[in-house]
UniProtKB/Swiss-Prot annotation:
Free-text comment on the cofactor: Binds a second Mg(2+) ion via substrate during catalysis.
InterPro entries assigned: Enolase (IPR000941), Enolase-like_C_sf (IPR036849), Enolase-like_N (IPR029017), Enolase_C (IPR020810), Enolase_CS (IPR020809), Enolase_N (IPR020811)
Protein name, UniProt field: Enolase
Keywords: Cytoplasm, Glycolysis, Lyase, Magnesium, Metal-binding, Secreted
Residue numbers binding (2R)-2-phosphoglycerate: 163, 337, 366-367, 388
Family: Belongs to the enolase family.
Source organism of the structure: Solidesulfovibrio magneticus (strain ATCC 700980 / DSM 13731 / RS-1) (Desulfovibrio magneticus)
Function: Catalyzes the reversible conversion of 2-phosphoglycerate (2-PG) into phosphoenolpyruvate (PEP). It is essential for the degradation of carbohydrates via glycolysis.
Location(s) in or outside the cell: Cytoplasm; Secreted; Cell surface
Gene of this entry: eno
GO MF term set: magnesium ion binding; phosphopyruvate hydratase activity
Length: 436
């Protein structure tokens, strides 16, 4: 029987050493599912609310024992006896039980933990791979990895305001090839940085965190690493950034401390456009602040036909907010983070809405991750085509990459790597590098 028989939760630690929630769901058949919930560093103000204990005597107030109690108490009472195959009904009932718009009463981390664990238990009950259980027999697209190899902003203690500099191996034939290309470039970059006297310590997501003179210098180092690894910048490996602009948006200005700049929305759009002109940059995430909707419209009008503009903090995986963005012509892509909305069902609804509006979708990790690889299966399940799950070190990031290798192997000839499709969407010609 696929009836839920037991629900258990515990407090575990994430990749930053902070507590998070892990949930186990057991069915009457004996099948079970386990899931751990991630946590972000730069978060959107409209995200579903994770519950923390606020007890300064434990984990600096970041404990999650209250969320664990909510799983084992009210949420367990809600879902025990329900059919694990009825994911939508289970998720909706948990939302109703919480009764708040942002899941703040029981905690989004508690609700999501149960939602993910139920999904895994159901797939195990049916003996199906998780990606196939969620997406069906047409789930066969392996995502292009957006690999974060230089960290800044809230993810690293350095002078870079832009949070993530990423490489995108468009020219690979398979996901396995893409992973190899990324790893080779990552290790080459490490050697180049070290040779120039930079520290090669890594940030929260496994990218290097050097102090550099400017954002342009970061781009130049990455392009040099791509070339010295034997690849062509642009056609084989393109670039992407996550500006996380909400983090440096103050009093209506974009304050780039590392470059001593204070920019208006229009100036920030021009600043980002300069990168597009100088480098093979095909994707910008959160180029403007979540509250700067007029600026986002300008950004989309100026660059939306040329590159991918990904909304993270502005949309927070929320279908209602995404609908506003679609209506107003804001962005052309959405980042998908399970814990921003708090259930599997709502996440899938958001992805479907994005696809109907011809927005691209990027399934994403958080900076505080665990060894849980759910998002790897999710990216294939929905044929997202892109995944953001960090750099080429730290096992919390590699757990997702390694799961995608297994999925590609399992799909055999049916597997389709999304790189050529993405290249056709956004890559036209190789811009000339900045020679200064």
């Amino acid at each position: 029987m696929s009836t839920i028989a037991a629900v258990w939760a515990r407090e575990i630690l994430d990749s930053r050493g902070n507590p998070t929630v892990e949930v186990e769901v057991t069915l009457e058949s004996g099948a079970s599912g386990r899931a751990a919930v991630p946590s972000g560093a730069s978060t959107g103000s409209r995200e579903a609310l994770e519950m923390r204990d606020q007890d300064a005597s434990r984990y600096a107030g970041k404990g999650v024992t209250k969320a664990v109690e909510n799983v084992q108490g009210e949420l367990a009472d809600t879902v025990i006896g329900m059919d694990a195959l009825q994911q939508v009904a289970i998720d909706n009932l948990m939302i109703d039980t919480d009764g708040t718009e942002n899941k703040s009463r029981l905690g989004a981390n508690a609700i999501l933990g149960v939602s993910l664990a139920v999904c895994r238990a159901a797939s195990n009950f049916l003996g199906l791979p998780l990606y196939q259980y969620i997406g069906g027999i047409n789930s066969k697209v392996l995502p292009v990895p957006m690999m974060n190899i230089i960290n800044g902003g809230a993810h690293a203690p350095n002078n870079l305001d832009i949070q993530e500099f990423m490489i995108i191996p468009l020219g690979a034939r398979t996901f396995a090839d893409a992973l190899r290309m990324g790893a080779e470039t990552f290790h080459t970059l490490k050697k180049i940085l070290a040779a120039d006297g930079h520290m090669t310590a890594v940030g929260d997501e496994g990218g290097f965190a050097p102090n550099l003179k400017s954002h342009d210098e970061a781009f130049k180092y990455i392009i040099k690493a791509i070339e010295e690894s034997g690849y062509r910048p642009g056609s084989e490996i393109s670039l992407a950034i996550d500006a996380a602009a909400s983090e440096f948006y103050k009093n209506g200005k974009y304050v780039l401390t590392g470059e001593n700049l204070s920019l208006s929305s229009t100036e920030m759009v021009d600043y980002l456009g300069g990168f597009v002109e100088r480098y093979p940059l095909i994707s910008i995430e959160d180029g403007l602040a979540e509250s700067d909707w007029p600026g986002w419209k300008t950004l989309t009008l100026n660059l939306g036909e040329r590159i991918q503009l990904v909304g993270d903090d502005i949309f927070v995986t929320n279908p209602d907010i995404l609908a506003e963005g679609i209506d107003q012509g804001v962005a052309n892509s959405i980042l998908i983070k399970l814990n921003q909305i708090g259930t599997v069902t709502e996440t899938l609804d958001t992805i479907e809405m994005a696809k109907q509006a011809a927005y691209t979708t990027v399934v994403s990790h958080r900076s505080g991750e665990t060894e849980d690889s759910f998002i790897a299966d999710l990216s294939v399940a929905v044929n997202a085509g892109q995944i953001k799950t960090g750099s080429l070190c730290r096992s919390d990031r590699l757990a997702k990459y390694n799961q995608l290798l297994r999925i590609e192997e399992e799909l055999e000839d049916m597997a389709i790597y999304y790189g050529p499709v993405m290249a056709g969407q956004w890559y036209e010609e190789e811009p000339e590098g900045d020679e200064e």
